[in-house]
């Protein structure tokens, strides 16, 4: 009898766990993308300026345009001043009623003095939104000792993917804390959700972004500051090397609009409904099967990249 009661109880617990998982999946997919209305971002930010790093290409540039569309002044940060000037011109042509400032910074420079100078420039304005977007990936997937670009590339990936969200957040948070308002968006990657073979350093550094952001949410949960992780899958950008959009692959502008609509409604999400759907489905697959699928995809990507590299070498 006791054994029977235990089995019945265990069955109810298992059923409750399955029901909770299903509800969580539907909540993650439908909540921020269908059911919940976007918040008043300007009110949540508490200030009129938005800082965006890596803002001259891809997702970062799209965030800059979308924030400008929503009436924010934008402070764009990237490595090359000429590209910053061109991006500034493009933004002002489309949104002439806002202000755009630029700051050139090479994020491979890990020196604290460099960050102090950059933060001194940025903190001259009241920053309501900080989008830590700048990032670096592999040229193509490979095992650690064969990564294209070698030690230098690995060092740059580690530096660029981890230091900016850490140090810029630390340097801009004081004014947000003083106002008890502000939004920080740390752009990671869905590569952080898995231990991805052939992407070791990229996957690991994006996991750092995810953990850092989650811990910052705990540290500042009573300060009126919204701190969000965005972990996209494939977006048609220069870094992803994907040119064509599809149902699962939005362009940067579509993605940025969707992602900003989730601020305040989800603290950790992919930023796009079909990305979230993919992530939730992948999460249901046993780890050993998921790892095999992802590794096979990466091996295929590497093979295609090496064939292209060989063709280009022969053409020279």
Swiss-Prot record:
Binding site residues for NADP(+): 52-80, 106, 206
A Pfam entry, by short name: adh_short
Active-site residues, as the UniProt record annotates them: 202 (proton acceptor)
A GO term from the CC aspect: apical cortex
Top-rank EC class of the record's enzyme: oxidoreductase
Catalytic activity, as annotated: a very-long-chain (3R)-3-hydroxyacyl-CoA + NADP(+) = a very-long-chain 3-oxoacyl-CoA + NADPH + H(+)
Gene Ontology MF term list: long-chain-fatty-acyl-CoA reductase activity; testosterone dehydrogenase [NAD(P)+] activity; very-long-chain 3-oxoacyl-CoA reductase activity
Cross-referenced CDD domains: 17beta-HSD1_like_SDR_c
Superkingdom: Eukaryota
EC number: 1.1.1.330
Residues binding substrate, per UniProt: 189
InterPro entries: NAD(P)-bd_dom_sf, Sc_DH/Rdtase_CS, SDR_fam
Keywords from the UniProt entry: Fatty acid biosynthesis, Fatty acid metabolism, Lipid biosynthesis, Lipid metabolism, NADP, Oxidoreductase, Steroid biosynthesis
GO biological process: androgen metabolic process; developmental process; establishment or maintenance of epithelial cell apical/basal polarity; estrogen metabolic process; fatty acid elongation; hormone metabolic process; long-chain fatty acid biosynthetic process; molting cycle, collagen and cuticulin-based cuticle
Pathway: Lipid metabolism; fatty acid biosynthesis
PROSITE patterns reported for this sequence: ADH_SHORT
Role played: Required for branched chain fatty acid synthesis. Catalyzes the reduction of the 3-ketoacyl-CoA intermediate that is formed in each cycle of fatty acid elongation. Very long-chain fatty acids (VLCFAs) serve as precursors for ceramide and sphingolipids. May also be required for sterol hormone production.
Annotated PANTHER family: HYDROXYSTEROID DEHYDROGENASE-LIKE PROTEIN 1 (PTHR43086:SF2), VERY-LONG-CHAIN 3-OXOOACYL-COA REDUCTASE (PTHR43086)
Family: Belongs to the short-chain dehydrogenases/reductases (SDR) family. 17-beta-HSD 3 subfamily.
Protein name: Very-long-chain 3-oxooacyl-coA reductase let-767
Originating organism: Caenorhabditis briggsae
Phylogenetic lineage: Eukaryota, Metazoa, Ecdysozoa, Nematoda, Chromadorea
